[in-house]
């Protein structure tokens, strides 16, 4: 238990507050226009308050022509910028890192 609770310095210099992480999963909680939803942002806020050191998001696509599945969040321009900022800030003050799982599904293009 002590090891799980101990901090971890990664080779890139990031320091995780502990060794507990939520791995990537495909939440499919974006809008039909592929923006983050308030429910998605709230989920990460709640998970961060659970004390994990790292939350890895589900699929964040970089091209709307190449979705992994419907309702993936897409980052290809600034149209969803405010909601993306809110999502990134959902872990503020908890010490939890949130890292996006960036994807490009070339098979769909």
What residues fall within each predicted segment?
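Conserved small/polar residues in nucleotide/adenosyl-binding loops
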Residues: 108-109
């Amino acid at each position: 238990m002590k090891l799980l609770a101990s901090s971890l310095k990664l080779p890139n210099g990031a320091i995780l507050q502990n060794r507990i992480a939520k791995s990537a999963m495909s939440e499919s909680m974006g809008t039909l226009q592929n923006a983050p939803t308030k429910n998605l942002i709230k989920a990460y806020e709640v998970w961060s308050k659970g004390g994990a050191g790292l939350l890895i998001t589900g699929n964040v696509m970089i091209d709307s022509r190449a979705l992994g599945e419907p309702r993936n969040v897409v980052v290809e321009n600034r149209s969803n910028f405010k909601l993306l900022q809110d999502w990134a800030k959902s872990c503020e003050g908890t010490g939890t890192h949130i890292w996006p799982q960036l994807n490009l599904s070339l098979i769909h293009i």
